[in-house]
Amino acid sequence: MATIEDNYEPFTLSSKPIDYIIVLGGWHTENAALPATSQLNNDSLQRLVETLRIYKIHPEARIITSGHHKSDTVSNAEKMKQSLVLLGIPEYKIITENFPKDTEEEAELISPRVQGSTVILITNADHMPRAMKYFQAQGIQPIAAPTGFWVKNTDSVKGWNYYLPKSKKLQQTTRAWYESLGRLVQWFKTIFN
């Protein structure tokens, strides 16, 4: 997983003003008894926290949330917006793109709006290489802001406990395969288009 995640450094600070912070969609499970933030899955929650962190550094930026609704009545873009507002971001600073079903559609739908702007792209570290390629194919050169790193410290000394089976490692392997297959599909599309 580290080889997938190491393509982009975590975001620190941009020397120029940021026009947009783009937060790619994730998942949520609707439950009216829970606050919006508690309805987000882990990926969405990690992206939400990174959005808040970067917005605190660059309050001049507008935030674009994206993602459709799958089987829920509210899109992931709208649920992220609700969560951001709940955490203090002014509603007028947030734009929702409620219809993209995947990263490729997100890039296609968002790119015309941000053309010629300075943008930050937030998604999970394992997904960032593929996401960047989709936006670059649309003529956008975003600043990567990866979050949700699976591998936190590649330089640490590994004790015997590291080599014991863990369910997290199975999740990591599943995600690594998912992203690797996604990149392969992306590559095939460039050949046949």
Can you name each region flagged by the protein language model?
Residues M1-L170:
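A structural signal for short, hydrophobic/glycine-enriched beta-strand patches
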Residues T3, T173-N193:
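A transmembrane-helix-recognition feature enriched in membrane-embedded lipid enzymes
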